[in-house]
Amino acid sequence: MGEVIQNINENAKANQDVFAATLLELAKADKNIVAVTSDSRGSGKLVAFGQTLPKQIVEIGIAEQNLVGVAAGLASTGKKAFAVSPACFLTARALEQIKNDVAYSDNPVRLVGISAGVSYGALGTTHHSLHDYAVLRAINNLSIIAPADNFETKEAVKLAVNQDKPIYLRFGKKPMPLLTEDPQVGFEIGKGRVIRKGADVAIIANGE
């Protein structure tokens, strides 16, 4: 029998909760950070952001193509725009805008897909985003980041703020086990980490 490893911090949060809290703290110190949402303040955990920094959030409504277009326009003027929307809709409805207005234009929009994968559960297949990796990996000039835990999420958001390139961040809804016990390991795009060493089998995974 294999050994069951319990590695869940009692204070573990959903990665998208950590994303929103980190973005709020960074935005307090940087007025160029702007959150753009598609009627997703609640699901994107941006209610506190809107209440605290009402001049740094733009509500588009349920219009994902317009969401990305507005974020692209803001980014082109020097704003650090985070376009926040459920991953299932952001990466399907707004694909043309992501491709042309963001990636191919080398426009540093921070695309944020929330409730990714099957996070929406009972809402059904219309709300599941099993396609976003495949779709976005086919687009040149777009970095894709799916943090594994709260530590990586916080570091990824800080990196995204300071990266002047198009980027896609992918977050789920469930509290995540803490896989990073030593913050000194740092965070780097494209660099994997060994969680546990063994000799019987190799398991390679990403994200949540």
Region spans (language model):
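A general structural motif
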Residues: 64, 178-194, 202-208
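Thiamine diphosphate
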Residues: 1-170, 175-176, 184-186
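Short, conserved, surface-exposed binding loops centered on an aromatic residue
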Residues: 160, 193-196
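Phosphate-coordination loops involved in phosphoryl transfer and adenosine-cofactor binding
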Residues: 54, 198-200
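Short, flexible coil/linker segments at domain boundaries that flank nucleotide/cofactor-interacting
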Residues: 28, 196-198
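Short hydrophobic beta-strand segments
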Residues: 34-37, 200-206
